[in-house]
Amino acid sequence: MFYLDSRHVYRVTELDSIEWLEHGFGTRLSDIPARFPRLATLKQVHSAACVAAEGRAGALGTGDALLENTPGAVVAVKTADCIPILLVDQRTRAVAAVHAGWRGTVARIALAAVEAMRDRFGSAPADLHAAIGPGIGKCCYEVGPEVAQRFGEWGRAHIDLAEANRLQLSAAGVTAGRIHASNLCTMCRPEEFHSFRRDREAAGRLYAFAGIR
C-alpha cells in the first residue's frame, strides 16, 4: 500500500520493514536531489538498457534502469507521466530504479531490469519486490493507432502503462503479492504531480529513488 509521508514522498508500506532500504516516489513538493546529494541518475532514452551504478553518483550515461547494491548509494529515475518502478531484493540487498514510458514498455524494460538483477546480483525474480509508482493512468492516456498497435491485446485507444508493466513483471517471475501498484495518475492530480502531457515543456520531473543505507 502506498502512503504519503511527512516529506511529501510516497512510500510503500510493505517495503518499510526492510531496515536497510531507502525508497520513495517524489511529488511536486519533495526535493529528492537535495536530500540525496550523491544521487545516481541516467540520461533516459526510452530503451531497455540497464546500467550498474557501482557506487557512482551523478549522471551515469544513457539507459532506463539503474542497478545498485553499494551501501550508502542511491539510484533514481525521473518521470513526468512515464511509469517509475522500483525493484528491491531483500535477500541480496540490491535495488533498481526503472523508467518505463510507452517505448520502454514495448521494449520490455521491466523484464530487462529483472533479468539484469538476476545476472548481476543473483536475484531470484520470486524474491523481488516491485513497486509501480505514479504515472499517467489509463483514464488520461489516449493514444493513436500507431502506438496502440504496438501493445497487441492491450492496444486500445487508452493504454494502461502500469498494468502492462505489471504483466511484464509477473511474466518475469515476480510474484503477484510482491507487486505493489500506486494507481495514482500524474495527469489527474496537478496539485501533487508533474505531467508532460498536461503541462508540456513547462512540466518538471518527479524522482523515484531506491538505495542502501
Language-model regions, residue ranges each:
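Active-site microenvironment for binding and transforming phosphate-containing groups
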Residues: 1-213
